[in-house]
Amino acid sequence: MDLNKKHLLYLIVFFLFINLNASGQSNSVSGKILNQSTKEPVRYASIALFKQDSVFLKGTTADSIGRFGFTNLISDDYVLSVSCMGFEAKKILLQNLSESAEVDVFLSESVLSLGEIVVSASSTISKINQRIVFPTKLQLSHSANGMQLLNTMMLPGLNINPMANTISSSDGGKVVLQINGVNATPEEVQTLQPRQIRRVEYSDYAGIRYGEASKIVNYIVTRDNRGGVIGVDLMNSLNILAGGDVFFAKFNKGKSEYALNYTTAFQKINSNNRTRTGSYRFGNSTPLHRDEIGDGGDYSYQMHDVTFGYNYQQSDSVFFNAKLKYALTNHPHNDFKSNLKENGIETGRIFDGVSQKINTPTIDLYYERGLKNQQKVYANVVGSFAKAETGRNYIEYDNADTLFSEQFGLVSDKYSLIAEGIYEKGFTDGSLKLGAKHIQSFTEQEIHQNGVFKSDLNQTESSVFAEWNHGKDNFSYSLGIRINRVHFSNSSVNKSYYNFLPKVMFGYQLSEKSFIRYDAEMSQTNPTLVELTDTEIRLDPYLAEKGNLSLKPYRNLNNNLFYENKKGLFTFNANLRHHYKHNPIMESIKEQSDFFLIMPENMKSWNRYNAEMTLKVGMIKNILQFSLTGGYNHFNSQGNNYSHSHSNFYYSANVLAMYKKWMFIGQIQPFDEKLYGETVTKSGNYHYLAIQYNANNFSFGIGAFNPFKNVSRTVIENKNYQAPFRRESFSSASQTIVATLTWNFSFGKTHGSGTKSIENQDTDYGVKGSYK
């Protein structure tokens, strides 16, 4: 797609979606939320407007000085409901509202949980960069945990995989989960009780402090000061040996909370299949064709994660959190067996087995303090150690001899320390954030392959950032800047790189139900430990790979134009995206004497153009809702000696039905396709059906993944001229029936604890899961 066509597409969609229809009602309700004791503004309180029959009409949050407002109201009776954590909820009856009214609401401080606000109809507040979703009574009663509740909301741009309990973004960016503003894991979200959740704040524009994250999902939960909860969240297969289970317990006493979470996942099958077809063209010779026909293989996996947490909260001004975590991932078998043909002639068999084990203890300390004049500071320090062990055994053999064999082993020890601090200041119509972050890591690797080779790498990354957010009337904008330094050093390299990384957002509220937003961001991607490991590994007789110590960090530029419009039961939104990488790290394949070497290099450029539309309908009669998404991708990959492009259309669909205590879920998710370097990767492609029964503190259900046909697989196609290949991986685990059970027991009064506003973790262990 050339530049003129791209600009034309942007303009057509921009003018097609602009809608300036706004109603002209003159009545309004506005005012301030104030602390009854201090008379100071209460920031970010939740305000909902109901009819007297409890039907939800509108909702908003107070700004940084406690202001709120509702416009375009007809003459009627209303109920104004105000709630904020740390205060008692208050409801005000507005009888016979026939003209605009100014209402100041005074809230009393309280250590008790908030009174329930029953929402019985549509309850989403759409802002330029955020959706605030108040869960309805129906959604709460049909959800067993925080993850299921999110699935009932069908938020645009989010893909929820109920099998893996993972959340991904349709634009490929990272999704950050939070509880009361703190980064959380999917397992922690699973432990949330629906009755705790007051609202979900979904931001599809993430500020510069969140790095490369594209979406933020923040659960706002209630707090008490005593009691506890214990519970389980189980999902296990009925036809294969596989499952994922969560066990949790929390105990609250005074200003302290103690929490213990244990998560385990496991899978064991003997139908791990891989089919690979490739050719090798050396010089001007006739290509050698090799076909590997899959013949099963063992796959086994275990994951154990134990987390002990303690936090202390003094009112809303001081919060301390300490977390001790130990994670073990054990992958003893990822084996493939194949029958081998060369130029159509059977030559033997292949065994390709990979094992991997990772141990990671972590300590995480966090401190937050609120200051006078709408100021707040945060500090976070994380220390971790990761020991990773990887082994590979590759053999080609016939009935009499071993034709080719290669053994490889790697032991990696990584020590890392992450420290971050943020200062925040609120103003009348905006806020300012200043922050600094430093990452220090040291890695030692020992490689066993025809001898023992040792290497080490020191890596540091330091950055400072500033961000200004402003909103007034119908216009909002955000300006941010990050200055970044990355340094690599070992016995053979000593390099530093500096980058200036801006981020901007401009949005305009076209009407009460529609808005348009544009944002642009420049970010940096660093080479991974695997890419920097300068050791050659033979994959088969004709193929090898190695890292590259001369790799440099590269920059990304993201542009996004977004439009949304709501009317009744219908919500429509559209995205135009462009993602550009300058000198990205992509693969190169070079001919050696008798084999080809795969090696990462900084290439010329990479582009992705994307157009996507989503239509959500519901709830219809408080029973049915569904959403449809369709889109188009175009990729262009420019290497130093190659040029490739790839295009694809895609779609997805979700349906949800709720009746009495029963819930039905249906999902269709097609292949996620991507061209990067010379390789097209297609992964995913599943459909899911489930039925669930919900009762107080208890639910069970039956679900089926790919019940009609096993369509899930991973397809990788390489387009290199001299050594192209096509690989397809699949197993019986992609077609399974699962049983789910959720149970929890509460005693006293429980609360979602005070929470952190920043969280850091180092997950680059310098190992790979497969090698061919």
Protein language model regions, located:
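Periplasmic plug
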Residues: 159-205
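Short, acidic, small-residue-rich periplasmic hinge/interaction motif at the N-terminus
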Residues: 48, 83-87, 100-140, 148, ...
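Short, acidic Ser/Thr/Gly-rich low-complexity loop/linker segments typical of extracellular
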Residues: 52-67
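Transmembrane beta-strands of outer-membrane beta-barrel pores
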Residues: 234-238, 253, 264-268, 326-330, ...
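Outer-membrane beta-barrel signature, preferentially recognizing the C-terminal barrel domain
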Residues: 514, 524-573, 580, 598-609, ...
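Face-selective signature of the C-terminal outer-membrane beta-barrel domain
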Residues: 303-331, 353-493, 499-502, 509, ...
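A short, solvent-exposed loop/turn motif at the edges and junctions
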Residues: 50-55, 81-93
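N-terminal periplasmic accessory domains that precede
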Residues: 102-106, 116, 120, 146-151, ...
